[in-house]
């Protein structure tokens, strides 16, 4: 078994899935609405319910944005399938209208590199101006203007989308919750420097499984890995001395960038005292579009 920073990394793999994502920049005149917009965009990962999930990729200085204001890069994802583009358009409308447009001074710009296609934002977002929307060229881009009660909300007319890789993950077996929090957030922060990835759950406390006695509600708790059930069930897979197992889920624009991100997350997390093992969840190779062995993610 390979060790990183003295912590064993189990010889296993995670499964990841094809997804469709939009990548865009949000800017604002003030840090307060910008932070609120980021929280709104990234809130409530809900692809398991047929909706969307999103996250902040990185923060931008004014010189890095089209309009010279502070901002952030975000990704929003839906499951891949025949109706994925239609679903992505609908979900973008929800998250941007209710999460960004309502925050004062915000603007949205396309940031998708090498897109497979474009969504015309005039329909799902611009038309909430109820006929008062209009387009012109600002910042060398075609922008849709939406008059609002604090001025105008601007969004680029075309937002690109592309196929990516969603659901790569790593598990951190920790001695206690304090170690799990420190290791988990250390991993998430390390990924802020990796272009093209997000962690839609940040530090996830509740990994799930597809098998359930309540199929009407969707995925449920991954009970073999719940430390409080270790002495109550026969199929517990929680070792003695482990009291918390945070999960770091990673979506990225390519398989290579997801693998690189998993390796960086492992390196960062294993620097924390109290991490006793690194592993990953999978479905026996039966569900995912990709199998990602952890050993292939670790940098030599």
Curated annotation (Swiss-Prot):
**SUPFAM superfamilies in the record:** Formylmethanofuran:tetrahydromethanopterin formyltransferase (SSF55112)
Keywords noted in UniProt: Transferase
Q: Does the keyword Zinc-finger apply?
A: no
Q: Which GO terms describe its biological process?
A: one-carbon metabolic process
Q: Pfam families given for it?
A: FTR, FTR_C
State the similarity comment.
Answer: Belongs to the FTR family.
InterPro entries for the chain: ForMFR_H4MPT_ForTrfase, ForMFR_H4MPT_ForTrfase_C, ForMFR_H4MPT_ForTrfase_fd-like, ForMFR_H4MPT_ForTrfase_N
UniProt name for this protein: Formylmethanofuran--tetrahydromethanopterin formyltransferase-like protein
A single Gene Ontology MF term assigned here is: formylmethanofuran-tetrahydromethanopterin N-formyltransferase activity
């Amino acid at each position: 078994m390979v060790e990183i920073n003295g912590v064993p990394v189990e010889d296993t793999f995670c499964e990841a899935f094809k997804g469709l994502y939009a990548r865009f920049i949000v800017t604002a005149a003030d840090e307060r609405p910008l932070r609120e917009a980021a929280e709104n965009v990234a809130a409530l990962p809900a692809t398991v319910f047929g909706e969307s999930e999103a996250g902040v990729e990185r923060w931008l200085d004014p010189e890095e944005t089209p309009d010279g204001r502070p901002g952030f890069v975000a990704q929003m994802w839906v499951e891949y399938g025949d109706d994925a583009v239609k679903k992505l358009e609908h979900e973008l409308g929800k998250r941007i209208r209710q999460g960004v447009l309502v925050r004062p001074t915000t603007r949205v710009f396309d940031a998708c590199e090498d897109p497979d296609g474009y969504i015309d934002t005039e329909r799902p977002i611009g038309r909430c101006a109820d006929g008062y929307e209009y387009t012109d060229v600002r910042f060398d881009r075609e922008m849709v203007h939406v008059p609002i009660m604090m001025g105008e909300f601007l969004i680029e007319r075309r937002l690109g989308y592309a196929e990516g890789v969603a659901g790569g993950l790593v598990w951190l077996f920790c001695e206690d919750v304090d170690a799990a929090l420190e290791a988990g957030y250390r991993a998430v922060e390390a990924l802020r420097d990796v272009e093209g990835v997000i962690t839609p759950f940040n530090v996830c406390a509740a990994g799930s499984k597809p098998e359930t006695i309540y199929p009407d509600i969707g995925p449920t708790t991954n009970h073999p890995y719940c430390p409080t059930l270790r002495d109550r069930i026969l199929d517990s897979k929680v070792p003695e001395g482990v009291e918390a197992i945070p999960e770091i889920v990673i979506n990225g624009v390519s398989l290579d960038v997801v693998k690189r991100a998993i390796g960086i997350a492992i390196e960062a997390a294993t620097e924390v005292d109290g991490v006793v093992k690194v592993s990953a969840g999978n479905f026996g190779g039966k569900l995912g579009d990709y199998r990602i062995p952890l050993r292939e993610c670790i940098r030599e």
